[in-house]
């Protein structure tokens, strides 16, 4: 079918009609690649409650809604995924993964769409990608024990270390309490105070400098529906928090999002102990997949028994915004070719930090 038949309309998330909302939910339900809570309409609604720039590019073909591209649109035409730095996974809500996104954006106010975690199965993102990488996941469809056995066969040494820490904690004589659905607001506050301290300590970008991001976490914590739930899980040792995790889940997928641990309990590997308990509990509560996200991180590679490809890059049309972004990318590429060692990466890191700030503040 000719992609030229597609027409587009940019609509605030809050302005979607009842028919459009039904189409969103229907297409997501029919597409297994959209099972992540990130693709739930309710997640878009929560973002829209906190950000005035939350929009959806509605794609229509022959009078039928063909898809939605949720985005945050800046005043100078740069579109980014909903949630900005919090948007680990994003993409088209559609039942047709071959839609021509370039053609769709040409008729919109968005001159550039920056993406960093879009399904590579959606050909519009794959064609425009500068990088495609695996997003790691834990497949629990055969149960938690089957996953652990799979990991033992893949890396026996890693699993021996995990079991040794489990025994060390179990035999410590300490009072151990797991709360897999911790509804205490004070535990949530302590979790994110620790997370933000971790960001400061490691010089990582703290997205929670933006009030909307802090408010979104509170909203998710209170939001409890089958399609979208904020989930706080904690491990306490002798009545003190030792590890915590805040994520969100849909009917079948948990997105592993903000894990933290308290350094004084590091010898017990509390974060990993908590994740194992979460996997066992949630496998019996409808969760068949835990999304760990992309990244060359040791624990993700060791624990994941599945993955799917995600794409990063830009879809753009000629514009001032596109030219500025292309110039920045060119400067980064030039610097990386110079014999400067680690210094050669500084321009790219600075540009990435600026882009993250822009996404956080809607610039």
Language-model-derived ranges and their functions:
Residues 89-94, 147-150, 179-181:
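Acyl-group handling in specialized metabolite and lipid biosynthesis
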Residues 62-63, 96-97, 139-143, 238, ...:
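Short loop segments at secondary-structure junctions
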């Amino acid at each position: 079918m000719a992609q030229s038949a597609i027409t587009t309309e940019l609509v605030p998330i809050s302005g979607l009609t009842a028919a459009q909302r039904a189409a969103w939910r229907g297409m997501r339900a029919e597409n297994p690649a959209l099972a992540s809570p990130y693709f739930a309409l309710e997640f878009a609604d929560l973002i829209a409650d906190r950000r005035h720039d939350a929009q959806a590019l509605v794609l229509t073909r022959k009078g039928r809604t063909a898809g939605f591209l949720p985005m945050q649109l800046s005043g100078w035409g740069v579109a980014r995924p909903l949630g900005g730095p919090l948007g680990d996974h994003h993409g088209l809500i559609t039942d047709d993964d071959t839609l021509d996104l370039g053609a769709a954006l040409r008729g919109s106010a968005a001159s550039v769409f920056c993406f960093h975690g879009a399904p590579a199965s959606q050909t519009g993102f794959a064609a425009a990608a500068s990088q495609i990488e695996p997003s790691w996941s834990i497949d629990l469809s055969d149960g938690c024990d089957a996953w652990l056995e799979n990991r033992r066969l893949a890396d026996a040494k890693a699993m021996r270390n995990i079991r040794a820490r489990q025994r060390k904690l179990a035999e410590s004589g300490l009072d151990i309490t797991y709360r897999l659905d911790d509804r205490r607001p004070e535990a949530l506050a302590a979790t994110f105070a620790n997370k933000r301290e971790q960001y400061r300590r490691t010089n990582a970008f703290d997205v929670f400098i933006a009030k909307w991001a802090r408010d979104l976490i509170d909203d998710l914590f209170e939001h409890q529906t089958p399609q979208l739930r904020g989930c706080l899980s904690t491990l306490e040792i002798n009545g003190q928090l030792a590890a915590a995790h805040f994520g969100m889940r849909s009917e079948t997928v948990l997105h592993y999002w903000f894990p933290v641990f308290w350094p004084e309990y590091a010898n017990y590997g509390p974060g990993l102990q908590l994740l194992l308990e979460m996997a066992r509990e949630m496998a019996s509560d409808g969760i068949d997949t835990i999304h760990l996200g992309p990244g060359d991180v040791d624990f993700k590679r060791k624990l994941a028994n599945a993955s799917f490809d995600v794409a990063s890059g830009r879809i753009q049309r000629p514009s001032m915004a596109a030219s500025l972004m292309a110039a920045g990318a060119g400067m980064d590429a030039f610097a990386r070719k110079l014999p400067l060692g680690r210094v050669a990466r500084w321009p790219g890191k600075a540009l990435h930090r600026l882009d993250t700030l822009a996404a956080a503040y809607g610039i």
